[in-house]
Amino acid sequence: MLALSPATRDGCDGASEFLDTSCGFTIINPEEEEEFPDFADHGDLLDIIDFDDIFGVAGDVLPDLEIDPEILSGDFSNHMNASSTITTTSDKTDSQGETTKGSSGKGEEVVSKRDDVAAETVTYDGDSDRKRKYSSSASSKNNRISNNEGKRKVKVDWTPELHRRFVEAVEQLGVDKAVPSRILELMGVHCLTRHNVASHLQKYRSHRKHLLAREAEAANWTRKRHIYGVDTGANLNGRTKNGWLAPAPTLGFPPPPPVAVAPPPVHHHHFRPLHVWGHPTVDQSIMPHVWPKHLPPPSTAMPNPPFWVSDSPYWHPMHNGTTPYLPTVATRFRAPPVAGIPHALPPHHTMYKPNLGFGGARPPVDLHPSKESVDAAIGDVLTRPWLPLPLGLNPPAVDGVMTELHRHGVSEVPPTASCA
């Protein structure tokens, strides 16, 4: 059985064009040599094929076609060569197929690399465009900032000389009638603008207004003090020296005593002044001569009142506390006995417990011992030299002893046992 299969290929325009024609022979039963003779023994294949049998059409129906056999034989040989080339290419070994696949993979890699390069080029182009836009926006922003800085007013440093000239111009024109343009003309300063002068004039008026208000308030207080106050300090018409009304006396209570003004402190030459941090201290050698010998003043604290000692468990004296939420009332006399209520009878004598806490009288401490006590301590040391010295006594220095001996006329001192 002879099968002819034309191969078609689609072009770019979508139309199918016949590029080549391949003829293949399929042998159904190769053992039957009678049905399929060898075509190689016969000459030309076209001479053997009967086209009338193939198409099944009578010869008188078809028109007479005169075809040059040489053309047909040449075209058919070309088609056979092309089909054999295609068949040989399709029947390559596995290794050749793998090589072809590798080559096709390389081609795909090359194509992919080209695509990547193209994409990177596009990306670079986009980045460059973005950078151009960013640079243009940054330059425009810088230009805008520079223009704004140029439009801003330069801050003026108002020196004392400049402020003095400003005040002179304002006083000449009047504080309420002064205008920035006239002040600028009178000052004659070229570095100032009308805006600078107007701002400084506003601040000057506000500050001057506050100063005038404070001066008026101080003058008002001074006037009231002179009207209602008395320089001698006496209470006149119920008013004190500072102008305030004295408190009226309460009904049923005596008037409050006048407040005594403390006299100025009297400085005596024999009292030590109060030491202030940072001032030089007084020499300690003259301290015994500075401080006079005196006793501490007696305490003015009153002792606790006596209480009755009783064995009754019903009554307990309260020493340091009182009943909460009740006023403290001093009981001077004992309450009379009531029938039915046991009362503790006082003993024949009362017990007074002195308060040894704070405020009680203590024996005076002699800060400066007398000469007799000092002589007694020295005599005790001389009689018992093996005992340690009492507190406050230090052994004399050798230089001091020698000086004292020379002062008394002793010039020669026998050597001690250690020196011998």
Swiss-Prot record:
- Quaternary context: Interacts with NAC92.
Phenotype when inactivated? No visible phenotype. Pale-green seedlings in double mutants glk1/glk2.
* Annotated source species: Arabidopsis thaliana (Mouse-ear cress)
Miscellaneous: Plants overexpressing GLK1 have a delay in flowering under long days, show high constitutive expression of genes encoding disease defense related proteins and are resistant to the pathogen F.graminearum.
The answer to keyword tRNA processing applying to this record is no
Please give the name of this protein.
Transcription activator GLK1
| Start-end of DNA-binding region | 150-209
Entry superkingdom? Eukaryota
